[in-house]
């Protein structure tokens, strides 16, 4: 017997009233808030009622049950559809009072669904296309968990409701293509095919045959009347049987049921108004006051929770009987073995002894070789730059269609899709995803990276070729503004390590984060090992530290990150040797970690001498660390095509230029007398900077 038959032959009649409950709760909430989107919940109420009433397995009393079906509202503007469902099936944190507080400060019912803000919200949606793309990652994770633990412990579907806007966004193409290639058979997308956009009919801007598009990408695709419950049920049954991901085009009318506005784009993003809602109540035979659901309809909806609870209890019996129970639970919880930190400490000690000189992208791969050998939680990948990002290790065999036992995803040239899929993998649980591309192409992934931070997901972005140091590929590939953009993002750790020691330290931090994503900005060019002091303390965890202390009281402090720390050290040594100026060097591998330290530590590291910041990127953001008497050595515009060494000299990011800036800073600090070294009394030479250097 299939799932839908279990509901009985009279299901369709009761489902009409169940769907109307969604419609009126959505209308009432938007009306009270005078803000929101009633049209989509009203239009998709019939199809979603069938999905929940006949198929989906979730248990509101255990919203994090690992083998639950996932429901993703990609068209997040229709959030009242989700909140209404959660109230009706009995989520504890979604009483009627929350629905009547829709879009108000402090309520659980935010304008768009927010992960972690209310129970049962699988992912934050709102930026169109993100939900369907994140769902691809969830479906990948489900297949990977099933490959490791079997269908007895992992056997669930990922259902998505997507709108026209989701399918128009470019990220959807990346996600659809990847899902079809991987044959993600547990992914089912219900498309709200209402042919309405904010501006009016969708034929204003598109003539796309979406069914043909999905079929070309390897999906099963069907078209049904979205207001015919039995037709929707048959389509879902077929989708659950196919060996491909599935699209069900639900032909709907936006604002379905509205007395005079049904089918109008005016129902998309505004309250219907008291008169229209009153007329709709009369039209649909719903005589109840706002925010009221008759007990018999609420009871019908609560059967969804009963079915989910029964499924969960059966699953728990299987888990208890499984010999893999402990390993399964540790995997779901992403519990890292404490050995990882010890192994990385030994790794740092070994390379400190050897004074290993490598590009930080290579240092990252070497650290990953240690990490991936110590834990099976990590899932790597790259957007077609594996050989450049160096994200593949000996333990991470590729995942391919039909084979999900591997630990490495070839995402193709789909940076945005990769980032969203990693969000989905992290949200699903069981894995720590990392993926690589060039730093400059973080622009392409920006929307999903922002959601990583907003949701607090342990996703790791390995972004290599982080400056003009990549050389001949030129300004299209040389990031300038990207570090500033990433550092401006709340709850995102941006690591730019200076050598192999810092790289390993930063990986130790990133792999242990629970609620913060990480970015690694890594060099193409080889960098010397600068940290030669013994000790296992992870100094990068402090965000910044004094790498080279001044000899005596500081005359000047040089601040730098990544590949420019080498330049700062060379400049400090020259200032000491040639000018007897006491210069300290501060390495700042992670601003966010440094900002989290107390004021006393800030003063200890930064000191009170004039400061020079050195970074082969734009200045934006550096002033918070530089202080009033300061200078910046870095980029003021785009790069150029040339060998890396030539570019550093051309743009003045050299030890010579840093020395000149230091002397000029000290001269300006004492305009009436030549500046002198703090301890020696030796006059500092007068420097006149060329216009190019200035």
UniProtKB/Swiss-Prot annotation:
Give the cofactors, semicolon-separated. Mg(2+); Ca(2+); Mn(2+); Co(2+)
A biological process (GO) annotation for this entry? Answer: pentose-phosphate shunt
Q: Which UniProt keywords apply?
A: Calcium, Calvin cycle, Magnesium, Metal-binding, Plasmid, Thiamine pyrophosphate, Transferase
Show the Pfam families listed in the entry. Transket_pyr, Transketolase_C_1, Transketolase_N
Q: Which is one GO molecular function term here?
A: transketolase activity
The record describes how the cofactor is bound as: Binds 1 Mg(2+) ion per subunit. Can also utilize other divalent metal cations, such as Ca(2+), Mn(2+) and Co(2+).
State the name under which the record lists this protein.
Transketolase
What is the scientific name of the source organism?
A: Rhizobium meliloti (strain 1021) (Ensifer meliloti)
Q: Which gene encodes it?
A: cbbT
């Amino acid at each position: 017997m299939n799932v839908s038959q279990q509901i009985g032959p009279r299901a369709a009649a009761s489902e009409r009233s169940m769907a109307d409950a969604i419609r009126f709760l959505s209308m009432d909430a938007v009306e009270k808030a005078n803000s929101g989107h009633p049209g989509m919940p009203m239009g998709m109420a019939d199809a979603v009622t069938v999905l929940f009433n006949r198929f989906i397995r979730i248990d509101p009393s255990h919203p994090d049950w690992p083998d639950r079906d996932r429901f993703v509202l990609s068209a997040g503007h229709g959030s009242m559809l989700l909140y209404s469902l959660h109230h009706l099936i009995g989520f504890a944190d979604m009483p009627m009072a929350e629905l009547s507080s829709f879009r108000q400060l402090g309520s659980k019912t935010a304008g768009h669904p927010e992960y972690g803000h209310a129970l049962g919200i699988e992912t934050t949606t709102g930026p169109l296309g993100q939900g369907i793309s994140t769902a691809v990652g969830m479906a990948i994770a489900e297949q990977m968990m099933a490959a490791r633990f079997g269908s007895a412990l992992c056997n669930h579907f990922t259902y998505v409701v997507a709108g026209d806007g989701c399918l128009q966004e470019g990220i959807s193409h990346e996600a659809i293509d990847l899902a079809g290639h991987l044959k993600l058979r547990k992914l089912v997308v219900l498309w709200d095919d209402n042919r309405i956009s904010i501006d009016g009919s969708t034929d204003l801007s598109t003539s796309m045959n979406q069914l043909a598009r999905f079929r070309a990408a390897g999906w099963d695709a069907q078209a049904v009347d979205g207001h015919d419950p039995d037709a929707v049920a048959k389509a879902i049954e077929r989708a659950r049987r196919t060996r491909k991901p599935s699209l069900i085009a639900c032909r709907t009318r936006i604002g379905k049921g509205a007395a005079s506005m049904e089918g109008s784009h005016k129902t998309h993003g505004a309250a219907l108004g008291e008169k229209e809602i009153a007329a709709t109540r009369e039209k649909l035979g719903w005589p109840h006051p706002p925010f009221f659901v008759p007990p018999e309809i609420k009871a019908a909806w609560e059967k969804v929770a009963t079915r989910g609870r029964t499924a969960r209890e059966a699953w728990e019996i299987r888990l208890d009987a499984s010999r893999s129970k402990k390993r399964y639970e540790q995997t779901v919880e992403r519990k890292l073995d404490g050995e990882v930190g010890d192994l990385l400490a030994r790794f740092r000690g070994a390379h400190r002894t050897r004074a290993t000189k490598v590009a930080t992208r290579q240092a990252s791969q070497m650290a990953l070789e240690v990490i991936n050998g110590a834990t099976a939680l990590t899932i790597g990948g790259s957007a077609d730059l594996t050989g450049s990002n160096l994200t593949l290790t000996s333990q991470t065999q590729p995942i391919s269609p039909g084979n999900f036992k591997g630990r490495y995803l070839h995402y193709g040239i789909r940076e945005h899709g990769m980032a969203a899929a990693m969000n989905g993998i992290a949200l699903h649980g069981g894995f720590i995803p990392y993926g690589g591309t060039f730093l400059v192409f973080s622009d392409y992934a920006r929307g999903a990276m922002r959601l990583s931070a907003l949701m607090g997901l342990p996703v790791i972005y390995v972004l290599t070729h982080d400056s003009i140091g990549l050389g001949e590929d030129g300004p299209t590939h040389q990031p300038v503004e990207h570090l500033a953009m990433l550092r401006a993002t709340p709850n995102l750790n941006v690591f730019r390590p200076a050598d192999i020691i810092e790289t390993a330290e930063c990986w130790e931090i990133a792999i242990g984060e629970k609620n913060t994503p990480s970015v690694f900005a890594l060099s193409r060019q080889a960098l010397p090992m600068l940290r030669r002091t013994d000790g296992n303390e992870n100094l990068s965890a402090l965000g910044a530290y004094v790498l080279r202390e001044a000899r005596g009281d500081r005359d000047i402090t040089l601040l730098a990150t990544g590949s420019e720390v080498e330049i700062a050290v060379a400049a400090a040594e020259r200032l000491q040797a040639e000018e007897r100026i006491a210069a300290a060097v501060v390495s700042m591998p992670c601003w966010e970690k440094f900002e989290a330290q107390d004021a006393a530590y800030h003063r200890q590291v930064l000191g009170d001498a004039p400061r020079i910041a050195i970074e082969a990127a734009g200045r934006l953001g550096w002033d918070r660390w530089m202080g009033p008497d300061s200078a910046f050595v870095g980029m003021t515009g785009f790069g150029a095509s040339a060998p890396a060494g030539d570019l550093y000299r051309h743009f003045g990011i050299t030890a010579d230029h840093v020395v000149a800036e230091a002397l000029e800073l000290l001269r300006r600090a004492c305009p009436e007398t030549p500046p002198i070294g703090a301890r020696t009394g030796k006059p500092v030479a007068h420097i006149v900077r060329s216009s190019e250097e200035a």
